[in-house]
Amino acid sequence: MASGDGGDDAGVKRVADRYLKREVLGEGTYGVVFKAVDTKTGNTVAIKKIRLGKYKEGVNFTALREIKLLKELKDSNIIELIDAFPYKGNLHLVFEFMETDLEAVIRDRNIVLSPADTKSYIQMMLKGLAFCHKKWVLHRDMKPNNLLIGADGQLKLADFGLARIFGSPERNFTHQVFARWYRAPELLFGTKQYGSAVDIWAAGCIFAELLLRRPFLQGSSDIDQLGKIFAAFGTPKSSQWPDMVYLPDYVEYQFVSAPPLRSLFPMASDDALDLLSRMFTYDPKARITAQQALEHRYFLSVPAPTKPSQLPRPPPKGDSGNNKIPDLNLQDGPVVLSPPRKLRRVTAHEGMEVHMHRADRTEEHPSGARHMDDMSSQSSRIPMSVDVGAIFGTRPAPRPTLNSADKSRLKRKLDMDPEFGYTE
């Protein structure tokens, strides 16, 4: 690659003499993503420019993991890494260009998703996950905006910066992965030994988000997230999840019985509810796998999944206006009195007494909005895509990401891992 960054006749910047730089698509903590044209092929690409940092800090280990893993993961439902090269003190990763992502689809109120459309998106997501797990790779950051959609309608898993090889029974991982709303309960309870089941739980949350057109479980803290989970599926018993009480950050919750799953997803088919229940199984050892999910009767029943090329997609960027469905939280969570700590008991609903052990101070957090009592009775009149923003008129909640403490913890772990986590 040439070292110059000269401009062409149109004044467009070149990157490494091959890529014509276009507009910026997004920015993050470690760099920027911009659109570009590959002059060698004529194809539009997306380039992630990652800051390499100071000399002593070395190359960003997260980027190295992503490069290593994506070179091994070649599948129609996984983003393609086309090129990777250092240039002017930065590391550049070149990906195929994808027009939009699943979050944009979910939040666009002009898009009406049929049951066949939802089935198609879930099928493509699970195909990508099944391929990863077959190759012993955990994604660990499943969420709608990491599921990219191309011009042909194909959905592809992207952002493998937190992905890791798994399979060694004694290997420990950090539990501070995934955005909180998509974390499995075993991660919230602090487990450091886990497998592909954590990706399946997150995939279940995405399935639920497609059905509801809003994030399903919106906790404001880890302990509040567990409260949201238990309010939706009931407090797990030891018979359901024997290993739960031995997890490092286990917290005892007051028992709450599970509401009917139909009351949470009134428009979903029986087959969809059955698959959801298997993806949301508490015991990770009993949770359905991605391959088993693909063989579930949900994908064999009518209607058949929509062909990717026929799926609805949002308009180009800049034309969507305010057509986003606000994030709502229609479930009561626990009264949060302090950060998680061992040997405590927390009630799952407002107004109930909370029994605490070794808790020194209290902090209150607001609960989410309540379910509308008559929603199930109206299910026959409600389309598959619900304009919940118009129904409830609630301000959107901020979508969580890894916070600074999580990032610092991850950075320390990465800096101390000389093998980058590629080998067992």
Curated annotation (Swiss-Prot):
Subcellular location: Nucleus
Region feature (Disordered): 303-337, 359-424
Predominant location category: nucleus
Residues the record lists as Phosphoserine modifications: S168
Record: active site: D141 (proton acceptor)
Keywords linked to the UniProt accession: ATP-binding, Cell cycle, Cell division, Kinase, Nucleotide-binding, Nucleus, Phosphoprotein, Serine/threonine-protein kinase, Transferase
Positions annotated to bind ATP: L25, G26, E27, G28, T29, Y30, G31, V32, V33, K48
Swiss-Prot/TrEMBL catalytic activity: L-seryl-[protein] + ATP = O-phospho-L-seryl-[protein] + ADP + H(+); L-threonyl-[protein] + ATP = O-phospho-L-threonyl-[protein] + ADP + H(+); [DNA-directed RNA polymerase] + ATP = phospho-[DNA-directed RNA polymerase] + ADP + H(+)
Tissue-specific expression: Expressed in actively dividing cells of roots, leaves and shoots. Expressed in the intercalary meristem and the elongation zone of internodes.
One MF annotation (Gene Ontology) recorded for this entry: ATP binding
Broadest EC class assigned to this enzyme: transferase
General function of this protein: CDK-activating kinase that may control G1/S phase progression. May control the rate of cell differentiation to accomplish proper development of organs, or in response to a changing environment. Forms a complex with cyclin CYCH1-1 that phosphorylates CDKA-1 and the C-terminal domain (CTD) of the large subunit of RNA polymerase II.
Record protein name field: Cyclin-dependent kinase D-1
Organism from which the protein derives: Oryza sativa subsp. japonica
